[in-house]
Structures are given as C-alpha cells and as structure tokens.
Amino acid sequence: MIEPSEDSFETMMEHKNPSSKQMESSEGSSNTTEATSGSGVRGEAGPASGPAQEKKEPPSGPLQEMEELPTDLLQDMEEPSSGPRKEIEDPPNDLLQDLEESCNGSHQARGDPLSGASDRMKEASVNPSGAREEQEAHTDLKESGREETPQEQNQTEHSTAELMAMVRSIISLYFRMQDLKEQQRVAEEILIKGINAGQLPAPKHFSGDRREFHEFIVLCQLTLQSYPRMFYNDRLRVGYVINHLSGLALEWAKALLQENSPLIGDFPAFLEAMSEVFEYRQALRVAEEAMFTIRQGGRSATEYIDEFQSLVPILGWPDEVLQAHLCQGLNEEIRHYLFRVPQPDSLDSLIVLILQIEEKLAERRAMLRLPPEARPRNLTWIDSPAPERWMVSSWLPSEVHPDINRAHLFLLLMVRVNPYHSVAVQALVDSGADGNFMDEKFAQEHYVELYEKPYPQPVQSVDGSLIGNEPVWLYTEPLVCIHQNHQESIEFDIVPSPNFSVVLGIRWLRVHAPEVDWIKGRCTFHSPYCLKNCFRPPPPCIALERHGMSLLPGLPHPYSDLADVFNPKEADDETSDQPSSDGSDDLSESEPSELQQAGDSDHSETFYECPSTAPWEPVGARMQERARLQEEYWDLQDMLTNRQDYIQMIPELFDQLHGAEWFTKLELRGTIVEESVNGHRTEDVWKAAFGLELEEMKSYQPFALSPDPIIPQNVIHFILKDMLGFFVLSYGQEVLIYSMSQEEHLHHVRQVLVRFRHHNVYCSLDKSQFHRQTVEFLGFVVTPKGVKLNKNVMTIITGYPTPGSKLSLRNFIEFVFPYRHFVERFSIIAEPLVRQLLSSYQFYWGVEEQEAFECLKRAFRKAPLLHHPKPQNPFYLETGVTGTALHASLIQIDDQTGKRACCAFYSRNISPIEVEYSQAEMKILPIRAAFMVWCRYLENTEEPIMILLNTEDLASLNNDRLTVLLPGHWVFFFSHFNFDVMELPEQDGGRALPPVRNLRWRRAFQRNTAARQTLLLASRGFPRDPSTESGEEENEEQDELNEQILRQELLAMIPIDQILNSFLAHFSMAQIRAVILHFFRGLLYWKNTLALAAILVLLRVRQCLSLRPAPAMRVARPQPQRSLRLILDSSLIAGSSITTAITQLLTQMPALVGANTIPAQELAELFLGPGRWQRNALHSQAHRGLQFTPGFWLTLCEFFGVRVTPQEGHLPALRQNRYLELHVVGDEDVVLREALQDDLQRYRQCGLHDGLQDTSQDKQDNDVQEAPPSHTAATHPPRPRHLMDPQVLEFLGSRLLHIHSADGQLHLLSREQAARALSQFLTLIYRRALPIPAWESQPREQARLEELPDEDEDANLD
C-alpha cells in the first residue's frame, strides 16, 4: 500500500495561479559538475616543474595575485585548466562577487559563467540606482560642505574589494587543500595495500563515476611514477590514463583527441581538467552540507542571507531551487508576512522583499512599545490579506508529520506542473513502489494535464506484489523535475495519495544509482548517467507577460487587459454620444488650455471657474469665500503666535510610506473640484491626500459621463476609501500608488485600475508614470529613503521678489510656512519677517528684514532630504536656544552610507511664561519640546536617545545625569524616555557625525557580517546619495582610523588559527600558492629525490607520546663504530635568540645518530619505493625514533648548499662514552662541546628529549656506523643550492619555525632568519660527520635534480 504523502509549497507562482498544496524543502544533495566534452586552453594549476614553469607564470604580488585568482567563496584557488566542459548558467552571484574583477587568461577564454552572472548582477543593481540619481538630479540644489570625490570612493571600494578577495582566496585555498588531503589519504591506503601484496594493484577502467575518481587518479600517478623511463613525457602519461577510461570518461577524452586539444600534451593540465569534470570536491560537499542545514535562527535576516549567498556561486543551483531553500530557513515570523504578498519572480527580488519585511517588523516592534493612541494608523497594513498567498504546510522537514508513522527519505523536488511555474514538493524515495506516482488531488489543484492509458495498470511494489485495489488509468506527460541542479523529465502515474504528493519508485533509483546517506536522509548523484544526462541547466519557465500584447504604446504588459481605462477612443465609445472618429479626445480647441491648467494645479482651483449649473455647487459661494479668506488670515495669525508643542505634520504625514520601494502615479482625466471651504490650505490638502481627514459618505451623486468629466474630490476619495492611506494617496488629478515589493506593486496598481473602470473614471496615459522608485507628488519628491521639496516649490520660494507690502509679505509667509519643517531653525531665521507682519505699525523693509529674507531663501535652497525615522534605530537629538526661540533636530545614521541623516527639524518662539524660566530650565526646555513633538518616535525606545550638548552645557552638569537638573513637574514626563547625553562634536565648515556613530556603525557592521553594506547596495539598488544634507564633512583622520579598524575586525572574524596555523597571514598570495600547491603536488607525484624524501619523512614521522612505546623496526646491519649524538641544552629552549629556531626545526626531524650502512639516497628509496621494505631483514629494538646516517645529513647539507672545507687536525677524535651538546654562545653562534656526565644526569632528571634520544652507555654498542657506499652504485646527488634559493626559502616557509618567548608564547621567524640558523646548524654537522660521500668529489656542474632510473634503484636496494 502506498505510504501517505506530504504537502508542498509553490515557489514559482504566476498571478493567476490557483492555490495549491505546498510544503517545505527537504534534505537532499546533488552536485554542480557537468560531463560534456569540449576543449579549452591550459590553466596555470598544476605541480611545479622547475624554474621554466615558474617563468611562464605572470609576475605575482599580493594585489596582482588576488586579481588573478578566482575569489568565489569555497572555489578552488587554482585557475581551472581547460577542459571540455559546458558551462552552466549560474544564478546571480553573492555580493562579494560584484566587488571583484573577472579572472583573466584562461578563465576569460572559457567564458566563466560566474563572471557573466556577476556582470548581470552589476547591471541589475546599478541601473535602478542610476535612474534614481538621474531623477533626483533635477531637484537637487547646491549644497555646501565637503563631498567625497570619485577618487576617494573608488579607492575605498578598491580596498574593500582587495580585502574581500584576500578572504575568499584564503578560504578557497583551505578547501582546495582538503581535496589534496583526500588524495593523499587514498594514496596512503593504496600504498599500504601494495606493501602487503608486494606490488601495486592495476588501475581499473574509469567510467566517469565520481565516487571512483580519487582512487583511479592516485593509482595512475603511482604507476606512472614507478616507471619513469617508460612514461618519460606528458603525452605518454596522458595516453596511459586515456587507455584506462571507458564510458562517459572515454567519450570526454575522445572529444579532446578529435579537437587536438593542448591538454593531450600537458599531463598536469589534463588532470586538472579531468578533476573539474569528474571530481566531487570538498568545497562542493561542504557547501551542500551547509545549504541543507542553514537556518536563520536567532540571527538577523541580513546575516542569514549573507551566509546563504556565499554558498550560491559554488553550488550553481537553479534560481527556483535557491528560492525554495532560502524560504525554508527563514524564521516563522518573516514567513508569516512573506507568504501574504505575491511570490517574487527571482532570487534577488525575494532577498529584497525579505530585507524589507525584516525592517518593517523591527519598526513594528518599536511602534508597539508606544501607547495605542500614539501608534500610526497604518501599523497593520502588512496584515492585510493578499489574493495570492504561498500555501505552506505547518510542519518543517526536520519535524514529524502527524500522519506519518515512521521516518522516510525525502528529496526537495521542483516539479514544473506547467510551462509557466514550478511547485516545490517533498518527493518520497523509500516507498517500496516500483513506478513514479503523483497524487490525484495535487494534479487537479495545479491543473496538470492528464492523459488516459489505453488499458488500466496495477500498482506494484518492488517484489511484484500489488498495492491497493484500484488500477491506474491516468498519467501525466513528462514533467521537468529539478533536485538542486539535477534535472530530468519524469512521467507520473496518477493515484490517490493524500499525504505524499510525489513518489519516486525503484525504477528511478535504478536509473540514477544515487549515493544515499540514510542517517542524514540525503541523496548524492555521481553516476555517469547523471553526469551525462541530468547535470545541465533546466529549461526556463515561460513568462506570461512577455507574450502579452499591449493595446496602447507605453502601457506596461501586466495592465494590457485594462487598456480601456487609458484609451480615449474606448472611453468615448462608452461614455459619449458623439465619439471622436480619430480616437482623440473630444475637446474643442479652447478646452485643452483649461484642461492643462487644471492638470498643472495641485489644488484644483478650477472649482470656482465651473459653470453655475454644476449640481454640487454649494449655496452662498461668495459668502463662504469671504469667510474662508478671513479664517485663513486669522489661522495664519494663530500659527505664527502659537507657543504650544504639537506633533508635526512632517514627518508624521509620510509614516505610511516607510518601506515603500515602488511608486506609480496616475493622472486622472477631467477636472477634480474641491467642495470644502478649507480645501485650499496647504496642510489641509496634505491631510486629505493622505487620508487623514475624510468626509463620511455612504454614496455619491453620479457625475456626468464624458471623456473629460467634472468629478468632486470627495467622490474620488470615496471610490478609494479602503485603499487611501494604505497603498494609495490621492488629491486633485494625481493618484499615487506605493508598494513594498515590485510583485505587490503590480497587484496594487491593478486594484486601482479595476476600481476606476468600475466607476467610469479614466486616466491619461501620457501623464502617468509606472513602476518608479522616485516620484513627485503634491510638491514633494518621494523616495524610498525619505522626502524632500521638488524643484517647482524651490523655484517659487527662491525666486520670490522682495516684498513691498504686508500683503506681499503675508503671501510669502503663508506659502513657506507649511514647509518650515524642512528648514533648520526656521523660527529664528524668519523672526524679523514675522515681527514685521504681526506689528500694527506701517510696513517697513529695512536691512534686518532683507537679511532675514535672503537667509530664509538660502535655507530653503539647502533644505536636505528628510529621511524616514526608523524607531528601531538609535536617535540623536540636537537642541538649543537662540535669543527668543528654541530649535531641535532629530538625527539618525544612514545604515548604508554611515553618514548623518536628518529626519526632522523643529523650532518655535519662546512663550512669555517660558521667558521666566531659570537658566537650567531654559537649557532643558528645547529637549522637552522635542520629546513632546516627536514622542511617537522617541518614547520607550530600545536604545538610549543621545542628546548632543555643547562643551559648556555638558560641563555644567558636573558629571551628573540630565535628570538631576529636571524640575519636579517634568520628572514624570521625562521618565517615559530612555536618553543619555554626550558632547556635541565640533563643526568645522560642516556637520561632523557624533563619535558614537562610528561605534554604532561598526557594531552593526560586525553584527550583520562584513558584507552587509554590499548586500544592501547590490540587492536593494540604493545609490550612495550625493545630495545629503548641506555642510556634511567627515574627519579624514577618523575615517582612515575607522577603515583600519573595520579591516582588523573583518580579518579577526576569519578563523586563521584553523587555517594552516595562522601562517598564511605572514605571506603574500603568490608565496602561499607556490608553497602549498607545489609542496603537496610533489608529495602526490612522489618525486624520487632525496630532498623531497626528507620532507615526506618529516611530515609523516610523529613522536610517540605514550609512556611505554612499542618497539620500532630497524634494518639489521653489522656492528658500527662510534657515531654522533646530539643532546639539546635546556637554555636552547628557554632562550629567545635566533638559534632557538633550530629547536623547533629539530622537534620535527629524526635524531642525529648512527643508524646503518644504507647510503643516504638508498634510504630515500626505502621510504619511497612501494613494496621494497621487505627486501631487508627487520628486527625490533628499543624505541629510539627514526634512525638516520650522517650521510643523510650530509646529503641534506649538499642540497641546501652548505659546504665547509675540512682542515687537518682541526677536529679532535671523538672519545668513547662522550656526547655532544648543542649550546648557544652569545646571541647568534652555535657550538658543540662534549657533554659531562653531570649534564647528562641533569638532562634525564629534567626529562629533556624534544625528539632527540639520549641513550645510555650500555646501549651504545648497538649503534652502527655508515659504511662507504658501493662504488658500483651509480648515484646522482642533488644539485647544490644556496640557502637564499627560492625553492629553499619555500621549503623553510612551509615549516613553522617559532621562538619561545619569556611568557611562553610562540613567535614566527622570517625565512631569512631560519635560513641563517639552518646554515649554522648544517655547517656544524658538515664538520663533524664523516666520511664524505663518494659523489662529493664529482664535478658540481654535472649534478642535477632528476628522477632515478629503474636499474639504479634496483642496484641500490640489492
């Protein structure tokens, strides 16, 4: 019987889709590699091949290397070799990708999809911001203060990109080393098996299964290294590997041969290209593991998205799959609101929507701390139901479904139920059924096209038994199913399965043969079938709007079915008895001017020009007009003399626009008239437009239908009453629609247009603006950040002529007074003008009035953009008293730019009662006034409000809090606010930001990870606003210090101690690349040279820390003579001189004692040659560590270029039962002297070994001395080198050499210091060790580094 199934949630939903079962994404695993043949150019990655190889690489430095290396997170450090690979279109990269330059060389030749995606990401993020800047440029006026130059901005961005590139390269290098470590582990296992069997196993044919790649490659490399004379060039080595390929891998290789690819003659590049196609790399494995377990948890959405986007480039999954995984890890609070808006059509849009919801929720939590009467009206607008919701089941994949009685294996499968959208379902894998099935109800809900079978078929299990009683009659066409980047077409049989929407049977498992992790419940696809057929980009969904035909030019496609709302001809056909023959407006030649005048007026003054026959004209219009003028005059008097603190019209008016990103402005046809007496007052117009003061209406009198109707204003408000103030603003002929996301905005615009069509209200298409991010409305420029005055208002104010009478002055004051909140210290500046207007004396215009008039116009010219206050962010309050007026400024910090953002200004004259206040009360008065005016933002804030005081006022507090000076009747009022005081920063030509701003910005920067700012810029498209408030100026030294601190904090967040023991920080990128890659490549290729043999031994030898060590194996040789022993003095460890570095080196090296008569180079063969250890008789002895001959050390001296001419009689003969000690003389010199017996006793008591064994006298007879090497052995010594040789320096750089300081800390030495210490040590050994190797007398120019032939190896080991 078929197991019950689960629900699914729809992730690619179009606007007209029905609701569907939806479910969370499940655990699963896939891959990103494709196996498609092709050719390319050779990459740089590969093992070192000598100086000639190094010369081919471009010059490298820290900066240049970072530009050359691919810097995608978790991506390989090496440039990929050319490989026949068909690139996949990756989704847009993360924010860090946008900061980097695309890789050059072979990376460009291959057309890297990551770079292309990055370019597309840049265009997507730059174009909206550029358009917004262009629109804002028309309303920007000149501002004083220092602005950042483009050079400074470019330099900052370049340094940030350089820092990000370094971080990503280090992480990429770490994961690439894990791949090499895995190959090394496989090589060790193969060597152990070969030693036990006596020979290396023959490599099996590789068919392309990625699970067998490591074993195949390592075995081929070991075999090739065992026969260097047979495979002496790269073409033969490549041919050997191709001869052991089959299936898909052979097809890939044949494609290279047919295209005559240069990879055939380059073995390292061939291996790298093969690795790109067939290797399941550690970076991909870790990224998939992280993607399956990533959850938001208690973090912010920004941090969660940062981590999510860091995994996107390396995974390369389709966009719809990434959307499903991103939604899966979100907190339930964000998901609750996310699924109430239409589904975004891309991952970038979804990220923007999530960030907006998080910000809106933070603002909501801050507003809920206010009393109910102080909360904004639109607080619950996000809770409004949406017609299309994301139907998501209530249980997560990690939880237990109530209808499932046991654990199952599920895959997150994106099923494309039709060509237009996909649905995410949890597909059951371990059902036991033989075929693939889909739930009948699920197919009906998603309108899946079904077909009838010619005859019914029973449902069978894997053993052939029948499941259920009803046969299968229906089936689907092949549907595209995507699991991460594994896509295929599956035909489903339709069965009733209420709990499981999709079931994958045994036939599916047989075809794909996935690797199943039953503990974690995941599947990974490695089979050749999947590499060949499944790992390719899925076909894109068909966008319906792309095929829509717009009936009117300029009308967006989503509204093409509503063209009759804009089409004049259709409007005439429906509303006029005499339609126009040419489809134009049925207007006379004299009417357009009147219509244009009505359209240009924000206040709809055409009401009083209407014919007297208008049915809605009020009675006694002239009397009401006179009353209106008299009331306006006295209202102006009251406003100018008012001394009370009330909530401001601005910014309260624009609270409902917080979070709005998209705007559409519709221009209504006809004439909109206002019946209200006070309808012409500016602030009343604003209240009506924003829905704050609406008339109570249950119906309206129908207006005459015509192409140019006359409609009362209250009728338009009645039509839009349930939308006004929530996502619509309307006054006169302008209707502004605003939304938080683009998908939601499409739905809101359609709602308005449908409502207008129903009420026969028509719009002008030529004057309408669709889908903008900056729009002008009622004299304001509205942006997602805030609001400012538009160009028309600024032109009227700044171009107003000098008043010549009180009437002219009153008109000027009456016009500018509603916009007073855009000017800092408005009451102080306009005080002479107001005094002149309110005086009973004859009008007089003097110098003081002229200066105030000009100063007021300059203040409006410099009026900044007022940002939307964010209650969830900290506030700064700047207040003061000047003369007879007080002023206050509400300030916050812009999250994106880190600069000062003005939210509101307030000023008023001091009342006669307040003049009698004491000096302390007068200083606190503006603070109290600001708290009263902005109480809806400042009351019960989570973080303290920072009150900025000047040095004099701050000193007057005497280190006491402000509450100490509060009068008794103000204490209760101030108890509602969380505030603190700080010194006001100095203002030298501009407004410097408070010092705490940098702390706040750094704290936010660290909390939201290093990429927060870049993420917001890339996702939201916000530009760096060049028109911030005038006079802004940054302290250059403070900015440089902050930048350095940010870099240090960013580097501190990298776990350097977990990445190669923190030594990467001391080297450049080129050195890291050369040391690590070449070093490990040398280990994997098993070069038969003595130097690399010594390095291999040093890496693999470990000290035995047990109390009773197991006996070691030793080669049996004749009894030796006396040899050298080295015992370390304790002062060598406790000292801090350069020589102490030798101790750290020797703790990783075997003891310097006599061992056996095997020559030094044969000793290397002993450790390298597989299966040759059994040729020597071994017996156990007491554990002393690994034994080496003096010849071994002499060979090491020769390799490092340390040579000393021995002098006769210079070195005394060693006496029996004596030891040699290593001592420090002065600060740099090292000498050997004979150890005294009491010294040895002291060493044994202290337990000083450090890896060098001090043996007792009774065991000295077991030592052996090295015999002269056989003259018949044809040996080739390594080429002598100098200690400053680059390869020697690389060797020293790969070893961690430290000095113990007095406090016990380790300090890393430089390579030059280590080379100097090593030179002294090897010189010492060279003088003491005898005999000289036989090959030392040979001409030095004939010695070179090369592989030993087979016959030489056999001769040395016989």
Curated annotation (Swiss-Prot):
Keyword DNA damage: no
Biased composition (Basic and acidic residues): 131-149, 1338-1347
GO cellular component: membrane
Annotated localization: Membrane
Membrane topology reported for the UniProt record: Multi-pass membrane protein
Miscellaneous notes: Rtl1 is one of at least 11 genes called Mar or Mart related to long terminal repeat retrotransposons. They do not correspond to functional retrotransposons, but rather to neofunctionalized retrotransposons genes. RTL1 is an imprinted gene located in a cluster of imprinted genes on chromosome 14. It is expressed from the paternal chromosome and has an antisense transcript with full complementarity to RTL1, RTL1as, expressed from the maternal chromosome, which acts as a repressor for RTL1. Excessive RTL1 expression and decreased RTL1 expression are relevant to upd(14)pat-like and upd(14)mat-like phenotypes, respectively.
Job description of the protein: Plays an essential role in capillaries endothelial cells for the maintenance of feto-maternal interface and for development of the placenta.
Protein name (Swiss-Prot/TrEMBL): Retrotransposon-like protein 1
Natural source organism: Homo sapiens
Gene coding for it: RTL1
